[in-house]
Amino acid sequence: MSHASIKSLAGENHLVIRGSRMKLTIIARSSDDFGVVVNSEERHKTKQSIFKVNVTDADLHELTESRVDKDHLVEFAFTFLLEREPVDDIQSAFNIKIISQYFPEFPEAVQNWIDENAE
């Protein structure tokens, strides 16, 4: 069960996870590399964390059968991670497939997310 609520506003996602308000911004740096900016606010303190995520075409096909765009997969991956660990525990740079080494349920969660959001 998801503990996050998500509201998309102008290409940014506003999240509430475990009582913390967060703004998630995904920036495509190249066809395979994405910047992720997480602005979090808890008890009137604001913090910004910046990440680099690599998603190859092969990764996208393996995880999603190319049914979603890379930026949407990165967005889902960060929501998934933030539901499970504090922002400070997320590696600053990683390939998206490494998530399943720490969270074996990630590929299945991706498939469930795609199936729930299929048109």
Predicted regions and their residues:
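Short, Lys/Arg-enriched N-terminal segments with co-localized hydrophobic residues
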Residues: K7-R21
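N-terminal intrinsically disordered, cationic/polar leader segments
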Residues: G19-L63, N95-N117
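Acidic, aromatic-enriched beta-alpha/helix-loop junctions
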Residues: K52-V87
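Generic alpha-helix structural propensity
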Residues: V68-F76, F94, Q101, E105
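N-terminal, charged amphipathic alpha-helical interaction modules
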Residues: P86-I98
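Ser/Thr/Pro-rich, acidic low-complexity intrinsically disordered regulatory segments
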Residues: V87, E116-E119
